[in-house]
Swiss-Prot record:
GO terms for biological process: D-allose catabolic process. InterPro entries: AlsK (IPR030883), ATPase_NBD (IPR043129), ROK (IPR000600), ROK_cs (IPR049874). The keyword ATP-binding applies. It comes from Escherichia coli (strain K12). The keyword Ligase does not apply. It comes from the Bacteria. The lineage of its organism: Bacteria, Pseudomonadati, Pseudomonadota, Gammaproteobacteria, Enterobacterales. ATP binds at residues 10-17, 142-149. Its EC number is 2.7.1.55. This is D-allose kinase. It catalyses: D-allose + ATP = D-allose 6-phosphate + ADP + H(+). One of its GO terms (molecular function) is glucokinase activity. Changing F145L: 10-fold increase in catalytic efficiency for glucose phosphorylation. Slight increase in catalytic efficiency for D-allose phosphorylation. Catalyzes the phosphorylation of D-allose to D-allose 6-phosphate. Also has low level glucokinase activity in vitro.
Amino acid sequence: MQKQHNVVAGVDMGATHIRFCLRTAEGETLHCEKKRTAEVIAPGLVSGIGEMIDEQLRRFNARCHGLVMGFPALVSKDKRTIISTPNLPLTAADLYDLADKLENTLNCPVEFSRDVNLQLSWDVVENRLTQQLVLAAYLGTGMGFAVWMNGAPWTGAHGVAGELGHIPLGDMTQHCACGNPGCLETNCSGMALRRWYEQQPRNYPLRDLFVHAENAPFVQSLLENAARAIATSINLFDPDAVILGGGVMDMPAFPRETLVAMTQKYLRRPLPHQVVRFIAASSSDFNGAQGAAILAHQRFLPQFCAKAP
Protein backbone atom coordinates (compact mmCIF):
# COMPACT_ATOMS: atom_id res chain seq x y z
CA MET A 1 0.00 0.00 0.00
CA GLN A 2 1.33 3.41 -1.00
CA LYS A 3 2.46 5.58 1.92
CA GLN A 4 0.30 8.64 2.51
CA HIS A 5 2.16 11.94 2.19
CA ASN A 6 1.41 14.88 4.44
CA VAL A 7 1.73 17.98 2.26
CA VAL A 8 0.92 21.63 1.83
CA ALA A 9 -0.02 23.30 -1.44
CA GLY A 10 1.16 26.52 -3.03
CA VAL A 11 -0.64 28.21 -5.92
CA ASP A 12 0.59 31.20 -7.93
CA MET A 13 -2.32 32.56 -9.96
CA GLY A 14 -1.56 34.74 -12.95
CA ALA A 15 -3.75 36.10 -15.71
CA THR A 16 -2.42 33.57 -18.24
CA HIS A 17 -1.17 30.62 -16.18
CA ILE A 18 -1.71 29.04 -12.78
CA ARG A 19 1.32 27.37 -11.24
CA PHE A 20 0.87 24.81 -8.50
CA CYS A 21 3.24 23.05 -6.09
CA LEU A 22 2.95 20.33 -3.42
CA ARG A 23 5.55 20.33 -0.61
CA THR A 24 5.98 17.48 1.85
CA ALA A 25 6.22 17.64 5.64
CA GLU A 26 9.95 16.96 5.18
CA GLY A 27 10.28 20.17 3.16
CA GLU A 28 10.76 18.55 -0.23
CA THR A 29 8.97 19.49 -3.45
CA LEU A 30 6.67 16.61 -4.38
CA HIS A 31 5.13 18.00 -7.57
CA CYS A 32 4.94 21.18 -9.66
CA GLU A 33 2.55 21.87 -12.53
CA LYS A 34 1.50 24.73 -14.81
CA LYS A 35 -1.92 25.10 -16.39
CA ARG A 36 -3.74 27.80 -18.33
CA THR A 37 -5.79 29.98 -16.02
CA ALA A 38 -8.81 30.11 -18.32
CA GLU A 39 -9.00 26.32 -18.46
CA VAL A 40 -8.66 25.86 -14.71
CA ILE A 41 -11.34 28.38 -13.76
CA ALA A 42 -13.75 27.50 -16.59
CA PRO A 43 -16.01 25.49 -14.23
CA GLY A 44 -15.73 28.26 -11.63
CA LEU A 45 -12.82 29.52 -9.55
CA VAL A 46 -13.43 27.38 -6.47
CA SER A 47 -14.33 24.23 -8.41
CA GLY A 48 -11.38 24.62 -10.75
CA ILE A 49 -8.76 25.22 -8.06
CA GLY A 50 -10.24 22.46 -5.92
CA GLU A 51 -10.16 19.90 -8.72
CA MET A 52 -6.63 20.88 -9.78
CA ILE A 53 -5.31 20.26 -6.27
CA ASP A 54 -7.48 17.25 -5.49
CA GLU A 55 -6.37 15.47 -8.67
CA GLN A 56 -2.74 15.58 -7.55
CA LEU A 57 -3.57 14.68 -3.95
CA ARG A 58 -5.23 11.51 -5.24
CA ARG A 59 -2.34 10.81 -7.59
CA PHE A 60 0.25 11.01 -4.80
CA ASN A 61 -1.96 9.62 -2.02
CA ALA A 62 -1.46 12.86 -0.12
CA ARG A 63 -3.34 14.74 2.55
CA CYS A 64 -3.22 18.55 2.30
CA HIS A 65 -2.73 20.43 5.57
CA GLY A 66 -2.94 23.93 4.14
CA LEU A 67 -2.88 26.12 1.04
CA VAL A 68 -1.24 29.48 0.38
CA MET A 69 -2.47 31.06 -2.83
CA GLY A 70 -0.84 34.10 -4.40
CA PHE A 71 -2.45 36.78 -6.56
CA PRO A 72 -1.19 39.85 -8.44
CA ALA A 73 -3.34 41.83 -6.04
CA LEU A 74 -3.65 43.75 -2.82
CA VAL A 75 -4.29 41.28 -0.01
CA SER A 76 -5.69 42.34 3.36
CA LYS A 77 -3.80 41.84 6.62
CA ASP A 78 -6.13 38.95 7.49
CA LYS A 79 -4.66 37.03 4.51
CA ARG A 80 -8.19 36.01 3.54
CA THR A 81 -9.50 39.06 1.71
CA ILE A 82 -8.55 40.09 -1.83
CA ILE A 83 -8.84 43.87 -2.07
CA SER A 84 -8.11 44.40 -5.76
CA THR A 85 -7.18 42.18 -8.73
CA PRO A 86 -7.23 44.45 -11.81
CA ASN A 87 -5.20 42.04 -13.96
CA LEU A 88 -7.17 38.84 -13.33
CA PRO A 89 -10.37 37.72 -15.09
CA LEU A 90 -12.27 37.52 -11.78
CA THR A 91 -15.44 39.20 -10.57
CA ALA A 92 -16.35 40.46 -7.12
CA ALA A 93 -18.58 37.41 -6.79
CA ASP A 94 -15.60 35.13 -7.49
CA LEU A 95 -13.63 36.73 -4.67
CA TYR A 96 -16.44 36.95 -2.10
CA ASP A 97 -15.76 34.53 0.79
CA LEU A 98 -13.18 32.82 -1.43
CA ALA A 99 -11.04 31.59 1.47
CA ASP A 100 -14.04 30.01 3.21
CA LYS A 101 -15.22 28.36 0.00
CA LEU A 102 -11.79 26.92 -0.76
CA GLU A 103 -11.46 25.65 2.80
CA ASN A 104 -14.80 23.88 2.52
CA THR A 105 -13.79 22.34 -0.80
CA LEU A 106 -10.27 21.27 0.21
CA ASN A 107 -10.94 20.59 3.89
CA CYS A 108 -7.81 22.47 4.95
CA PRO A 109 -6.91 26.03 6.01
CA VAL A 110 -6.33 28.60 3.25
CA GLU A 111 -4.44 31.89 3.22
CA PHE A 112 -3.76 34.41 0.45
CA SER A 113 -0.64 36.39 -0.37
CA ARG A 114 0.53 39.08 -2.75
CA ASP A 115 2.37 37.26 -5.54
CA VAL A 116 5.60 39.19 -5.11
CA ASN A 117 5.89 37.81 -1.57
CA LEU A 118 5.86 34.30 -3.02
CA GLN A 119 8.87 35.02 -5.23
CA LEU A 120 10.60 36.68 -2.27
CA SER A 121 10.01 33.62 -0.08
CA TRP A 122 11.59 31.34 -2.67
CA ASP A 123 14.59 33.61 -3.25
CA VAL A 124 15.22 34.03 0.48
CA VAL A 125 15.18 30.28 1.12
CA GLU A 126 17.25 29.50 -1.98
CA ASN A 127 19.93 32.00 -0.93
CA ARG A 128 19.84 31.02 2.77
CA LEU A 129 18.73 34.47 3.90
CA THR A 130 15.80 33.52 6.13
CA GLN A 131 17.36 35.04 9.27
CA GLN A 132 18.35 38.29 7.58
CA LEU A 133 16.60 41.51 6.57
CA VAL A 134 16.10 41.32 2.82
CA LEU A 135 14.57 43.63 0.22
CA ALA A 136 13.56 42.44 -3.24
CA ALA A 137 12.92 44.52 -6.35
CA TYR A 138 11.32 42.69 -9.27
CA LEU A 139 11.20 44.82 -12.41
CA GLY A 140 8.64 43.11 -14.61
CA THR A 141 5.30 44.24 -15.98
CA GLY A 142 5.27 46.60 -13.00
CA MET A 143 7.82 47.38 -10.30
CA GLY A 144 7.35 44.63 -7.75
CA PHE A 145 8.87 45.06 -4.32
CA ALA A 146 8.83 43.05 -1.10
CA VAL A 147 10.43 43.00 2.34
CA TRP A 148 11.57 39.95 4.34
CA MET A 149 11.77 40.75 8.04
CA ASN A 150 11.78 38.61 11.20
CA GLY A 151 11.64 35.39 9.21
CA ALA A 152 8.66 36.21 6.98
CA PRO A 153 7.38 38.67 4.37
CA TRP A 154 6.60 41.99 6.06
CA THR A 155 3.20 43.29 4.98
CA GLY A 156 2.68 46.36 7.15
CA ALA A 157 -0.26 47.42 9.32
CA HIS A 158 -2.94 46.60 6.74
CA GLY A 159 -1.27 43.98 4.56
CA VAL A 160 -0.36 46.25 1.65
CA ALA A 161 3.25 47.27 2.41
CA GLY A 162 5.89 47.27 -0.29
CA GLU A 163 4.20 49.20 -3.09
CA LEU A 164 7.43 50.77 -4.36
CA GLY A 165 5.95 50.92 -7.85
CA HIS A 166 3.37 53.39 -6.59
CA ILE A 167 5.55 56.02 -4.95
CA PRO A 168 5.04 59.39 -6.73
CA LEU A 169 8.38 59.46 -8.56
CA GLY A 170 7.09 58.80 -12.07
CA ASP A 171 5.68 60.83 -14.95
CA MET A 172 3.31 63.34 -13.36
CA THR A 173 1.56 63.86 -16.71
CA GLN A 174 0.35 60.24 -16.64
CA HIS A 175 -2.10 58.37 -14.45
CA CYS A 176 -1.05 54.93 -13.28
CA ALA A 177 -3.30 51.89 -13.74
CA CYS A 178 -4.01 52.19 -10.01
CA GLY A 179 -5.66 55.57 -10.65
CA ASN A 180 -3.05 57.80 -9.03
CA PRO A 181 -0.95 60.34 -10.95
CA GLY A 182 2.78 59.94 -11.45
CA CYS A 183 3.44 56.53 -9.90
CA LEU A 184 6.94 55.14 -10.45
CA GLU A 185 5.51 52.47 -12.76
CA THR A 186 4.51 55.14 -15.31
CA ASN A 187 8.16 55.41 -16.36
CA CYS A 188 9.86 52.47 -14.65
CA SER A 189 8.21 49.18 -15.61
CA GLY A 190 7.84 46.68 -18.41
CA MET A 191 4.66 48.51 -19.38
CA ALA A 192 6.61 51.75 -19.79
CA LEU A 193 9.28 49.98 -21.85
CA ARG A 194 6.63 48.54 -24.14
CA ARG A 195 5.02 51.97 -24.66
CA TRP A 196 8.39 53.43 -25.62
CA TYR A 197 9.17 50.49 -27.91
CA GLU A 198 5.84 50.83 -29.72
CA GLN A 199 6.17 54.59 -30.34
CA GLN A 200 7.90 53.91 -33.66
CA PRO A 201 8.92 50.93 -35.83
CA ARG A 202 11.93 49.02 -34.47
CA ASN A 203 14.16 46.56 -36.32
CA TYR A 204 14.43 44.25 -33.31
CA PRO A 205 11.93 42.41 -31.08
CA LEU A 206 10.96 43.82 -27.70
CA ARG A 207 12.79 41.04 -25.84
CA ASP A 208 16.09 42.24 -27.41
CA LEU A 209 15.58 45.86 -26.41
CA PHE A 210 18.65 46.00 -24.16
CA VAL A 211 20.81 44.38 -26.84
CA HIS A 212 20.07 47.23 -29.26
CA ALA A 213 18.93 50.21 -27.20
CA GLU A 214 20.57 50.14 -23.77
CA ASN A 215 21.97 53.64 -24.29
CA ALA A 216 18.74 55.19 -25.55
CA PRO A 217 17.79 58.18 -23.35
CA PHE A 218 14.48 56.62 -22.26
CA VAL A 219 16.14 53.34 -21.28
CA GLN A 220 18.84 55.14 -19.32
CA SER A 221 16.15 57.21 -17.61
CA LEU A 222 14.28 54.03 -16.66
CA LEU A 223 17.43 52.58 -15.11
CA GLU A 224 18.06 55.82 -13.24
CA ASN A 225 14.52 55.87 -11.87
CA ALA A 226 14.82 52.25 -10.77
CA ALA A 227 18.15 52.96 -9.08
CA ARG A 228 16.79 55.95 -7.16
CA ALA A 229 13.76 54.02 -5.96
CA ILE A 230 15.79 50.97 -4.90
CA ALA A 231 18.39 53.16 -3.19
CA THR A 232 15.64 54.96 -1.30
CA SER A 233 14.32 51.65 0.02
CA ILE A 234 17.83 50.59 1.07
CA ASN A 235 18.45 53.86 2.91
CA LEU A 236 15.12 53.44 4.71
CA PHE A 237 15.41 49.77 5.70
CA ASP A 238 19.18 49.17 6.03
CA PRO A 239 18.93 45.57 4.74
CA ASP A 240 21.52 42.82 4.74
CA ALA A 241 20.81 42.04 1.10
CA VAL A 242 18.80 43.18 -1.91
CA ILE A 243 17.46 40.68 -4.44
CA LEU A 244 17.10 41.95 -8.01
CA GLY A 245 14.93 40.12 -10.52
CA GLY A 246 11.80 40.17 -12.64
CA GLY A 247 10.98 39.72 -16.30
CA VAL A 248 12.69 42.91 -17.47
CA MET A 249 15.90 42.03 -15.63
CA ASP A 250 15.75 38.57 -17.21
CA MET A 251 15.81 40.05 -20.73
CA PRO A 252 19.00 39.46 -22.77
CA ALA A 253 21.80 41.97 -22.07
CA PHE A 254 19.97 43.69 -19.21
CA PRO A 255 22.68 45.88 -17.61
CA ARG A 256 22.44 44.51 -14.07
CA GLU A 257 25.88 45.72 -13.02
CA THR A 258 25.06 49.19 -14.30
CA LEU A 259 21.84 49.23 -12.27
CA VAL A 260 23.72 48.17 -9.14
CA ALA A 261 26.35 50.88 -9.68
CA MET A 262 23.64 53.50 -10.23
CA THR A 263 21.92 52.38 -7.03
CA GLN A 264 25.12 52.46 -4.99
CA LYS A 265 25.66 56.06 -6.06
CA TYR A 266 22.66 57.10 -3.95
CA LEU A 267 23.33 54.98 -0.85
CA ARG A 268 24.19 56.61 2.47
CA ARG A 269 27.88 56.39 3.32
CA PRO A 270 29.59 54.68 5.02
CA LEU A 271 26.55 52.52 5.81
CA PRO A 272 24.63 50.87 4.26
CA HIS A 273 26.80 51.55 1.19
CA GLN A 274 29.76 49.46 2.34
CA VAL A 275 27.88 46.36 3.47
CA VAL A 276 24.65 45.82 1.54
CA ARG A 277 24.81 42.87 -0.88
CA PHE A 278 23.05 42.62 -4.24
CA ILE A 279 21.87 39.15 -5.29
CA ALA A 280 20.37 38.09 -8.62
CA ALA A 281 17.00 36.36 -8.32
CA SER A 282 16.73 32.95 -9.90
CA SER A 283 14.40 32.64 -12.87
CA SER A 284 11.94 29.75 -13.01
CA ASP A 285 8.32 29.18 -13.93
CA PHE A 286 7.66 27.70 -10.50
CA ASN A 287 9.45 30.04 -8.08
CA GLY A 288 6.19 31.71 -7.08
CA ALA A 289 4.33 28.44 -6.52
CA GLN A 290 7.26 27.00 -4.59
CA GLY A 291 7.44 30.18 -2.53
CA ALA A 292 3.74 29.77 -1.73
CA ALA A 293 4.36 26.19 -0.66
CA ILE A 294 7.25 27.33 1.55
CA LEU A 295 4.96 29.84 3.28
CA ALA A 296 2.30 27.16 3.66
CA HIS A 297 4.86 24.78 5.15
CA GLN A 298 5.93 27.40 7.70
CA ARG A 299 2.34 28.28 8.51
CA PHE A 300 0.54 24.94 8.63
CA LEU A 301 2.82 21.91 8.88
CA PRO A 302 4.55 22.87 12.15
CA GLN A 303 1.11 22.72 13.79
CA PHE A 304 0.54 19.27 12.34
CA CYS A 305 3.97 18.01 13.35
CA ALA A 306 3.51 19.28 16.92
CA LYS A 307 0.32 17.23 17.21
CA ALA A 308 1.66 14.12 15.57
CA PRO A 309 2.37 11.17 17.88
